[in-house]
From Swiss-Prot:
Assigned keywords, A-Z: Nucleotidyltransferase, RNA-binding, rRNA processing, Transferase, tRNA processing, tRNA-binding
GO annotation terms (biological process): rRNA catabolic process; rRNA processing; tRNA processing
The protein's role, per its UniProt record: Phosphorolytic 3'-5' exoribonuclease that plays an important role in tRNA 3'-end maturation. Removes nucleotide residues following the 3'-CCA terminus of tRNAs; can also add nucleotides to the ends of RNA molecules by using nucleoside diphosphates as substrates, but this may not be physiologically important. Probably plays a role in initiation of 16S rRNA degradation (leading to ribosome degradation) during starvation.
A Pfam family the protein falls into: RNase_PH_C
Protein name in UniProt: Ribonuclease PH
SUPFAM superfamilies in UniProt: Ribonuclease PH domain 2-like, Ribosomal protein S5 domain 2-like
Organism: Corynebacterium diphtheriae (strain ATCC 700971 / NCTC 13129 / Biotype gravis)
Top enzyme category: transferase
UniProt lineage: Bacteria, Bacillati, Actinomycetota, Actinomycetes, Mycobacteriales
Complexes and interactors: Homohexameric ring arranged as a trimer of dimers.
GO molecular function, one term: 3'-5'-RNA exonuclease activity
Amino acid sequence: MTDFSRADGRAVDQMRTVKITRGFTSNPAGSVLVEFGNTRVMCTASVELGVPRFKRDSGEGWLTAEYAMLPAATAERNARESMRGKVKGRTHEISRLIGRSLRAAVDLDELGENTINIDCDVLQADGGTRTASITGAYVALADAIAVLKEQGVVPGNPLKAAVAAVSVGVIDGQVCLDLPYEEDSRADVDMNVIMQGDRFVEIQGTGEHNTFDRDELAVILDFAQKGCQELFAAQKAALEQ
């Protein structure tokens, strides 16, 4: 669709400005502020000696993740889920997605019987909070593992290739990369794609308001691959600073 335009002026295959700031807080072994445009997420990686009961005496480590949004992360304040006494299904789903995605980046055998806890707290939400969380948390994870290696805690080299994630949607028949909230809320098709190198870790896709065919899916995945390659470069640049 040649007359299609995005509210922020980006090309349809263009990412928002991505910033990754390491050492955002001082207590965790790894700490990052990741920004996808106006979406900002604090990602931390904390190390715990030992593993959950189901992993004991296995020789393997474990990685788990928690995701949450601060009350004022959105235009209208939302009460903390802990105060309501119940965590939403969406929060559980995203927490599990982050954990699955980052376990793809770690060799649990090489981690030894140690646990890495990933916490992703959304400071400001403008679409793509789960994809920003995964992308930023990988950098925090890399820093945490570097600390473990320096301390001689881990027996091997647990970190594998980088993992990054991006959203892609179809809006008015046009595939668009990295959706802010304004686009995400009206997308006909909405996908989150997690990649490691040129391989897919997970693909979440829904025809929110319309169906899609194989040709559209191919374009969506091409856009996602382009975005993830740019995110890999941003992660690498951040870790080299």
